[in-house]
């Protein structure tokens, strides 16, 4: 049995499209980046436009950044 498109989308999402490696708090953003990659690669199958993906990514990142950093400026755990 061939894997479904949804299963392939999960397999192929690894946030590898992050353009540079020195992003502060990169691990804290990994899930949001994975969702954005998945949306870009597979969104058409589910009826999403790239603008929808970008809007969702903006909301995800805004929510993550709202938590801020600790007193030493370190990323949230």
Swiss-Prot record:
Q: Does the keyword Nucleotide-binding apply?
A: no
The entry's function note states: Heterodimer: conodipine-M catalyzes the calcium-dependent hydrolysis of the 2-acyl groups in 3-sn-phosphoglycerides. This activity may be supported by the alpha chain. Conodipine-M inhibits the binding of isradipine (a ligand specific for L-type calcium channel) to L-type calcium channels.
What does UniProt give as GO cellular component?
extracellular region
Q: Name one GO biological process term.
A: phospholipid metabolic process
Does the record carry Transport as a key word? no
List the InterPro entries.
Answer: PLipase_A2_dom_sf
Q: Which reaction does it catalyse?
A: a 1,2-diacyl-sn-glycero-3-phosphocholine + H2O = a 1-acyl-sn-glycero-3-phosphocholine + a fatty acid + H(+)
| Name of this chain's protein | Conodipine-M alpha chain
Q: Which Gene3D superfamilies match?
A: Phospholipase A2 domain (1.20.90.10)
């Amino acid at each position: 049995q061939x894997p479904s498109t949804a299963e392939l989308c999960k397999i192929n999402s690894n946030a590898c499209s992050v353009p540079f490696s020195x992003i502060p708090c990169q691990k804290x953003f990994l899930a949001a980046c994975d969702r954005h990659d998945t949306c870009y690669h597979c969104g058409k199958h589910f009826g999403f436009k790239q603008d929808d993906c970008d809007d969702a990514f903006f909301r995800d990142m805004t929510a993550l950044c709202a938590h801020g950093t600790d007193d030493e400026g370190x990323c949230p755990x």
